Curated annotation (Swiss-Prot):
GO terms for molecular function: copper ion transmembrane transporter activity; symporter activity; transmembrane transporter activity. Keywords: Glycoprotein, Lysosome, Membrane, Signal, Symport, Transmembrane, Transmembrane helix, Transport. Pfam families: MFS_1. Belongs to the major facilitator superfamily. SLC46A family. This is Lysosomal proton-coupled steroid conjugate and bile acid symporter SLC46A3. It comes from Homo sapiens. SUPFAM superfamilies: MFS general substrate transporter (SSF103473). The keyword Transmembrane applies. The gene is SLC46A3. The keyword Transmembrane helix applies. Optimum pH is 5.
Length: 461
């Protein structure tokens, strides 16, 4: 008997994703550090390889390393842009007919292949530039955005009531927070006690178990398409794919279409800033004046991941006394405050305190997805999440590339500039959400509007 709980797959995937990020960044950082100069990292050092004295030649050297790491991250992100966009859009769109498991399986295969390649790269000390090729190839199978999009669509398929969608998505965020928090907290100890080789191997094993669970134990609430759809040619399949996306907007009334576009803009602009700035935190913490080691970076990652847990608690409590849109406002403005505080953090204590306003960072992601799911029909959920995932893939890669480029250009004169810029950019989703509020957003009214449009379509037939 198949299981209809996607949570175990999310648990394992979140563990692998959270551990892969800081490990890969610090591995590349050390390789570039050692190849750029005659300096080596000490594996048992209790302090970061970092120089705080600006007059020291080591200080200029580490600034050069920061620039090189940032540029390399930029190259990796760009290499996976096009294949990631195509695969994400196609896989999630066809999931409305072929089931949600298909994109989960394919993206899990890609993640597993990439993690195995990381193990080999680290063990045999291959040129780290080969990571660019693995990113390019792995993106064809989909990425974590594809996986999360399929998981969210899987969950929405099982939720009949609108409030249930918000709570269920918030529970997923809680699970993500629990896993990513503990993983982030332990990531530094993984590096220190096990080294990069064994750490990457653990990631590969967890992804293999995840793939086995999805293949053999996870059921799919969405049935396979009819034989007529299966026998469609490839060109007809693509036409049908884009046609469904076009009809998602065309079939909506003017007011609902405007709201749909506005909410998508809000989600993507917020996603652009939050995802784009995320990799910069580690580089910022490695650099002077903080000079954090791998353990402190793990603590910082754990505090950042705690926002999943606190966001779940916030949604659970706030849902009794306020609407989704008000919760989104709270998340945006607290995140903006955290960005501004981080820009001026010059000590370890200040950096930890700057993490506090990020406690509700995940709230807008959950409630905005829930709001979007309420303005489309149940048969359009897969197409909607395909659009979201496609835009998130495009926005995420563009954001990471943009912020890495900005950080590389500004790290020498003011490393915190990127965080100040992020705080300013968060005004865009805040203003967009204000416009949504001015359109008299009401969850019940849009539910009735969708029902009326559906009845009109039925009568036309």
């Amino acid at each position: 008997m198949k299981i209809l709980f996607v949570e175990p797959a999310i648990f394992l995937s979140a563990f692998a994703m959270t551990l892969t990020g800081p490990l890969t960044t610090q591995y590349v950082y050390r390789r570039i550090w050692e190849e750029t100069g005659n300096y080596t990292f000490s594996s048992d050092s209790n302090i970061s390889e970092c120089e705080k004295n600006k007059s020291s030649p080591i200080f200029a050297f580490q600034e050069e390393v920061q620039k090189k790491v940032s540029r390399f991250n930029l190259q990796m992100d760009i290499s996976g842009l096009i294949p990631g966009l195509v695969s994400t859009f196609i896989l999630l769109s066809i999931s409305d007919h072929y089931g949600r498991k298909f994109p989960m399986i394919l993206s899990s295969v890609g993640a597993l292949a990439t993690s195995v390649w990381l193990c080999l790269l680290c063990y045999f000390a291959f040129p780290f530039q080969l990571l660019i090729a693995s990113t390019f190839i792995g993106a064809f199978c989909g990425n974590y955005t594809t996986f999360w999009g399929a998981c969210f669509a899987y969950i929405v398929d099982q939720c009949k009531e609108h409030k249930q969608k918000t709570i269920r998505i918030a529970i997923i965020d809680f699970l993500l927070g629990l896993v990513t928090g503990l993983t982030g907290l332990s990531s530094g100890y993984f590096i220190r006690e096990l080294g990069f080789e064994w750490s990457f191997l653990i990631i590969a094993v967890s992804l293999a178990v995840n793939l086995i669970y999805i293949l053999f134990f996870l059921g799919d609430p969405v049935k396979e398409c009819s034989s007529q759809n299966v026998t469609m040619s490839c060109s007809e399949g693509f036409k049908n794919l884009f046609y469904r996306t076009y009809m998602l907007f065309k079939n909506a009334s003017g007011k609902r279409r405007f709201l749909l576009c506005l909410l998508l803009f809000t989600v993507i602009t917020y996603f652009f800033v939050v995802i784009g700035i995320a990799p910069i935190f580690i580089l910022y913490e490695l650099d002077s004046p903080l000079c954090w080691n791998e353990v402190f970076i793990g603590y910082g990652s754990a505090l950042g991941s705690a926002s999943f847990l606190t966001s779940f608690l916030g949604i659970w409590l706030f849902s009794y006394c306020m609407e989704d849109i008000h919760m989104a406002f709270i998340g945006i403005f607290t995140t903006m405050t955290g960005m501004a505080m981080t820009a001026f953090a010059s000590t370890t204590l200040m950096m930890f305190l700057a993490r506090v306003p990020f406690l509700f960072t995940i709230v807008p992601f959950s409630v905005l997805r829930s709001m979007l799911s309420k303005v489309v029909r149940s048969t359009e959920q897969g197409t909607l999440f395909a659009c979201i995932a496609f835009l998130e893939t495009l926005g995420g890669v563009t954001a990471v590339s943009t912020f890495n480029g900005i950080y590389s250009a500004t790290v020498a004169w003011y490393p915190g500039f990127t965080f100040l810029l992020s705080a300013g950019l968060l005004l865009l989703p805040a203003i967009s959400l204000c416009v949504v509020k001015c359109t008299s957003w009401n969850e019940g009214s849009y539910e009735l509007l969708i029902q009326e449009e559906s009845s009109e379509d039925a009568s036309d037939r």
